From Swiss-Prot:
Transmembrane segments: 10-30, 41-61, 72-89, 105-125
Function: Fluoride-specific ion channel. Important for reducing fluoride concentration in the cell, thus reducing its toxicity.
InterPro entries the UniProt entry points to: FluC
Gene Ontology terms: biological process: cellular detoxification of fluoride
Protein name: Fluoride-specific ion channel FluC
Catalysed reactions, semicolon-separated: fluoride(in) = fluoride(out)
Gene Ontology molecular functions: fluoride channel activity; metal ion binding
Organism encoding this protein: Synechococcus sp. (strain JA-2-3B'a(2-13))
Pfam families membership: CRCB
Keywords annotated in UniProt: Cell inner membrane, Cell membrane, Ion channel, Ion transport, Membrane, Metal-binding, Sodium, Transmembrane, Transmembrane helix, Transport
Compartments, record wording: Cell inner membrane
Annotated family: Belongs to the fluoride channel Fluc/FEX (TC 1.A.43) family.
Membrane topology (UniProt): Multi-pass membrane protein
Length: 130
């Protein structure tokens, strides 16, 4: 039996293994099937992760018999490593459910904009350190 203090990190880590392997092999499959000219795998993975995250979190919150460890294993571990996009959309939707529409919109657009800028910064830093 796992120590109570290790249950949370164990659940997240165990779920992450399956999520990351699923993402990896599905990405390969889509690239082999449709070619590398468009990131179909990433698109399908991100969208399917959002559907599954929405379904799972709705069901998990309505059913107390689903333990916190199972929520963490699947919601944070599996889906978090399958796609972080689903978590991003869940956070946005949560803000909107709280009627914090402006905050949700700023978060949603800001994540896209600042994510692109952060990517550009990372590229710039990598080029500077060559």
């Amino acid at each position: 039996m796992v120590s109570p203090s290790l249950r949370v990190p164990f659940a997240v880590a165990l779920g992450a293994i399956g999520g990351s392997l699923s993402r990896y092999y599905l990405s390969l499959w889509f690239a082999e099937r449709f070619g590398p000219s468009f990131p179909y795998g990433t698109l399908i993975i991100n969208l399917s992760g959002c559907v599954v995250m929405g379904w799972f979190m709705t069901v998990a919150m309505e059913r107390p018999e689903i333990s916190p460890e199972i929520r963490l294993l699947f919601g944070v571990g599996f889906l978090g490593s399958y796609t972080t996009f689903s978590t991003y959309e869940l956070d946005t939707f949560s803000l909107w459910q709280q009627h914090r529409f402006a905050t949700g919109l700023v978060y949603w657009l800001g994540s896209c904009l600042f994510g692109a800028l952060a990517m550009e910064l990372g590229i710039l830093l990598a080029r500077l350190w060559r």
